[in-house]
Each structure stands twice: as structure tokens, then as C-alpha cells.
Amino acid sequence: MTDNVVHIPTGPRWRFLIAHQSDAVRHVIRTLVETEQTSIVEVADGEAALVELERGRFDVLVLQLDLPLKDGISVMQLHRLLLAHERSPVDPPAIVLTLAAEVRGNVTLTDHLQSLGVDGFIDDAPMPQTAALVETLLQAREARRTIGKPAAA
């Protein structure tokens, strides 16, 4: 006789990497997205972001475009190489913090960032829209995860 036991995972459901040189900005972003279901790693430069990306998987990346040591573009490029090397089917949503006008006014930069997997842009002074964008991206990711799975009986 087998037990019909449902194992409910404990601990955080979503892992975030927040890479920004400002302690204050990282704190604001953490405050906007932190729940019991999130685990958040904060770093202050691009090299530290790459170290964390090599250590483990993240569900959402929040990157400052002009990070010190390695900028956000370099971080995204190297992250893409890591994903390709691992042949990972999971590509976490990425949000870039920058001056919105800087990106919106530069079609080439916008296209390049999107080709690297950037899903959204937020002004470098994060606002409540950050939480809404993160929620939308997580819902889209969850939908991608469930596509192709057999329906529960």
C-alpha cells in the first residue's frame, strides 16, 4: 500500500540576484520584491554578479546597466554563455536598471539588450512599478515552466 503523501516544498520559491552599486537602491528593490517566497542575493559590482551566477541559478536578475568592474551588458553576455554551455532550458527574466530615456532613445542598445535576454527596463531610481514588472515576469516564467507538462489527473 502506498501513501498518498504530498510533499510541499519549503523555503523560497523564487531566487533573485540584485546587482547595483548603491546600497540604498538595492535596499529599495529588496523591499519591493521581498516576500516569504523569495531568496535575495545582493552584489555591488558586475564581477560579484558573475560569481553568484556561476554559483547557482536565479529566477530573476535585476542589473544596473553601468555596474562597476563589469557592466550589466557584459554580465548578461557572460550569463548567456553560461546558459548555453549548460544547455539550460531555463533563462531567468532580467530587468535592467538604467535611465529609461538612455535606453528608449537608443534603438540599437534596446535591441542589443533584448537579444541578450533583457525583459524590462526600469529607471535607476526604482519605484513601485518594479514590483509589478517582477510579478508579470514571474507569471510568464511560471507559464513557460508548465507548458508541455502532462495535466494532473
Where are these regions (language model features)?
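Non-catalytic signal-transmission and effector/linker regions of two-component phosphorelay proteins
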Residues: 1-23, 27-30, 127-153
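Alpha4 helix (beta4-alpha4-beta5 surface) of REC/receiver domains from two-component response regulators
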Residues: 74, 101-123
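A short, hydrophobic beta-strand element within the central beta-sheet of small alpha/beta folds
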Residues: 86-107
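Active-site residues of response regulator receiver
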Residues: 63-66
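Two-component/phosphorelay signaling modules centered on CheY-like receiver
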Residues: 23-41, 116
